[in-house]
Amino acid sequence: MSVDVTNETQWVIDPKVFSDLGIWVLDQMRVSTQSDLTIMFVDPNPIAELHMRWMNLEGPTDVMSFPMDELRPGDGKTVMEGVLGDIVICPWVAAQQAAAAGHSTMQEMLLLTIHGILHLLGYDHVTPEQERQMFGLQRQLLLTFFALRHDANVQATLPAGTPDALALYDAAHGAGRDLDSK
């Protein structure tokens, strides 16, 4: 199983943590060990462009998933192999959401990674029942992953003096964006 992690931001992010999480979640969901996944961390501008292009929604968002092969979770046996797809995460939006939720940016980005994987596997949260199922599963996966890890306190940070890319985005594109209205 291959999980490639790319960081195109100034955030200091340990790619191994996200690779380990991706491999573990795919194993738990019984996706073939021959499957590939890419996780990419980007700044607000690139994810805002993707958000507009693919969802016709303005502004940066927290996570977007781009499926490749239509792989689905296994039912006790491993599913066929293939390229699962790409997950794009914006640490700036994750940090804002984490502050509002009262947990760390790292915890939020790990949650968003699981959320993105579940979308790639066909889960959605359009209806209340779908939301209950998907959010329950992502919470269960995240808490179990934390329980199994000995380094659960690893953090994602910004070097001192790094400009706030989300504030710069808002200044260039107009403030007043409401993250809760996604």
Curated annotation (Swiss-Prot):
Entries under InterPro entries matching the protein: MetalPrtase_cat_dom_sf_prd, YbeY, YbeY_CS
**Localization in the cell:** Cytoplasm
**Which keywords does this chain's UniProt record carry?**
Cytoplasm, Endonuclease, Hydrolase, Metal-binding, Nuclease, Ribosome biogenesis, rRNA processing, Zinc
Q: What cofactor is this protein dependent on?
A: Zn(2+)
What does the record's cofactor remark say about binding?
A: Binds 1 zinc ion.
The highest taxon in the source lineage is: Bacteria
Q: Which GO terms describe its molecular function?
A: metalloendopeptidase activity; RNA endonuclease activity; zinc ion binding
Annotated GO biological processes are: rRNA processing
PROSITE patterns documented for this protein: UPF0054
Q: What is its main location?
A: cytoplasm
Q: What's one GO-annotated cellular component?
A: cytoplasm
- Give the coiled coil ranges: none
Record-listed E.C. numbers:
3.1.-.-
Q: Return the similarity comment.
A: Belongs to the endoribonuclease YbeY family.
PANTHER family (alphabetical): ENDORIBONUCLEASE YBEY, CHLOROPLASTIC
Its function, per the record, reads: Single strand-specific metallo-endoribonuclease involved in late-stage 70S ribosome quality control and in maturation of the 3' terminus of the 16S rRNA.
HAMAP family, alphabetically? Endoribonucl_YbeY
- What NCBIfam families does its record include? rRNA maturation RNase YbeY
Name this protein carries in UniProt: Endoribonuclease YbeY
The taxonomy runs: Bacteria, Bacillati, Actinomycetota, Actinomycetes, Bifidobacteriales
Which gene underlies this protein? ybeY
